[in-house]
Amino acid sequence: MRRITRITTVGIASAALALSATACGKSSSEAGSSSTSDSKAVKAAIAYDIGGRGDQSFNDAAYAGLQKAEKELGVKGAEAEPSEGESDADKVQRLTALARSGNNPVIGVGFAYAPAIEKVAKAYPKTTFGIIDDTSKTGPNIANLVFNEEQGSYLAGVAAAKTSKSHTVGFIGGVEVPLIKKFEAGFVQGVKDTDPKAKVLTQYLTQPPDFNGFSKPDLGKAAAQGQLDKGADVIYSAAGLAGSGAIEATAKAGKWAIGVDSDQYMQKGLAAYKDHILTSVTKDVQGSVFNLIKSVKDGKPQSGEVRMGLASNGVGLAASNPAYTKMTDVIAAVEKAKKDIVDGKITVKTTP
């Protein structure tokens, strides 16, 4: 059963009680009668990024890691959802409540948690804090879980260029921030290295401090339609929940979409469009969350930069669509590019 702890601007004490009462797998009434042994169980928590659980992408990948830890490690999990338009102070309050409730580790899903984690980690030095997609804030009890997104995106560019009939492809970024620029840079380089004459249409949905580009599917849908109208027949979106709108528009037009973060061909919420999801650039967010939880449980908590790239299968390109697996020339080109990146023959740019 899905149990989400929602913390917005409630007081710290009441928030902590709410978290304790809604740990994954327990109703509030069950939690109220917890035994002493329950209170000593290892607990772990994740605080979701914009879009929350159900985004069919980034947040859901993190949740899958927590689920795996619950099943394989016997960990008691807790979750906390973001609120629209929240401040860093709201994030501090959420993370504080999670730490005060005894969760260890506490994981912030997304770079937006960096300032809050830096502050709360100092207040709870015995708790390990994980942050995904950020290295700007460090500390002895902070694990920076990061990925070479540009490498996976390069492979997507190769696949897009090899698949396109119009020699025009599209990239849609949710919000124009350095992280998403990495996706763009790798994708464009992969396209151009494969087909120098190809045209890459690039659009960002919003600019900071407006982060709706990660959460509004209608924005992604409109952007994709604009690129389709300009002749794009393969569109890659790095836009969280907003990317689902781009996938919908692309699929309805009978063109190819490329997903991100999770294998979006396999996501139930996108089942109606999966035949047009050529592939997805995957990040092993699930594995990074699970590994951090396991390290804490084993008494050897990770800290510092924990980077995952093509060489460690931390990023990659999904091959779930049977139509894609039949494209032997595309797969051969992707595999060659992967080998060349791992061997150091290709250096992928991190900025456009």
Locations of the language-model features?
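N-terminal export and membrane-targeting signals
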Residues: 1-14
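A residue-level marker of the well-folded mature domains of exported/periplasmic proteins
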Residues: 3-6, 24-26, 32-352
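Intrinsically disordered, low-complexity segments
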Residues: 12, 18, 31-37
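C-terminal motif of bacterial Sec signal peptides marking the signal peptidase cleavage site
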Residues: 19-23
